[in-house]
Amino acid sequence: MKYNFDEIINRANTNSKKWNPDIYKATYNGHNDLLPLWVADMDFRVAQPILDSMSKIIEHGVLGYTGVDEEYYQAIINWNKKRKNSHIEKEWVVFTNGVVPAISFMVQTFTQKGDNILIQTPVYHPFRMTTENNERNIVTNPLINNEGVYTIDFEDFERKIVDNNVKIFILCNPHNPVGRVWTKEELIKMGDICLKHNVLIISDEIHSDLIFKEHKHCSFLTLDKKYFSNLIVCTAPSKTFNLAGVQTSLIIIPNENLRKAYQKTLGNVRIETPNSFGIAAIKSGYTEGEEWLDQVIEYLDNNRNFIEEFLKENLPEAKYVKPEGTYLAWIYLGDVLKDREIEKFFEEEAKVAIDYGHWFGEEGRGYIRLNFACPKSILEEALNRILNSLK
């Protein structure tokens, strides 16, 4: 089946956090007339097999309590083996209703108030928020920024762990917002340091199905089993198949002791199984959604390249390195905007809703994160709004 990702679907009159003006205006100083390219979901219609599986539930007419069966687990296991070359066991899979709440429960389970947690800035800001909201402390290992290409400062990484008695390291792979897909060698270096100092690795791999053709994602689950003693991997069909509203995520915990401790925390708040639509989405997405996903990645690749071409031709002062994974463009506009206030420029002049770089840490100041998982016509309009507002 050929999918049409140029189709514009009106999401403004839904409860879309991204598109509903009455919702997003709280984030953008009351402005409700912006073109949204911020929240990390796609503006594409979901794969037809997933929609069909959900329609069957509605047609059946009963929405009772749910449980999961063998088909559910096999869909997850087979997908991970085929797409990611990772072997997981049925028993390792733990359900939560989202990666961010899942990480919050991990912080509560495996640390005490006042403990230190390491992140690599600029990074997805809920990592900081959920840590600090749980009364733990953030320690940063800033990524090295070489003209928009980011690498890891391993000496600083280990020094920060030792000096601060770090308990948890939250890794983002692929990295949001900078778009790096960490290599096997980079993961091994971080893994060995964490193993040496008994640091729990939480690897957020929610974007791991969205990798561009010249790169390959390497999960911690594909590495030496020695890392499994202190490893939790967070995945979900939400980014892969545009299902954030279904609120279903999959937490992979190979170590039995870690898994039991975590399940106890979840059991205390009665987080047990996905909802009816989450189960259907996982089964149908992971067994019949591959064709849709491959077409999405191809479309995203074209959008990724279009941004590069547009900026080179019209805004050469902007700094943009194409992401290796994710559908998020990380663009430096400090030399373009100069002394202009970035919020005022986007909200009052360009009228485009993006994520401001400083939301991801001070290292992101002057940057924007732009979501290009949208029809090309919308992306082109947003870029032209930015360009025309600079004239």
Task: Label the predicted regions.
Residues D52-S53, K225-D301, E309-F310:
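Conserved core segment of the aminotransferase class I/II
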Residues V336, F345-I354, F360-K391:
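PLP-dependent enzyme catalytic core of the Aspartate aminotransferase-like
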